[in-house]
Amino acid sequence: MQYKIKIRDSTTPELLDSFFEHAWTYRKPVKFVIDVTECKRVSLGRILSMKGVLDKHRPNSRRYIDHSEVIVRSRWARRLLSIGLGIIRTERPVYISTPT
């Protein structure tokens, strides 16, 4: 099952938490497709602010996520996200792409 999430500058950790909670209700393997192309304020601090949410959902991530794809708008955002994910240490593979 593919679960799409659109992240904007206004997305809070609480909203991201609700997206994950909803995805787990299906109790099926899932591939997250996270679109962050509308974010204009990308920073390492903002990426790391989501760590608490990801830590909370680690048990379900191990159980249900096959892999995730994050779509970013620039090579700079791709590099920054790659650094942030290295610090966070995700449970499953995360592939980062730019729109073509």
Please give the residue ranges for each predicted region:
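Amphipathic, Lys/Arg-enriched alpha-helical "gate/interface" segment within cytosolic domains
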Residues: 1-100
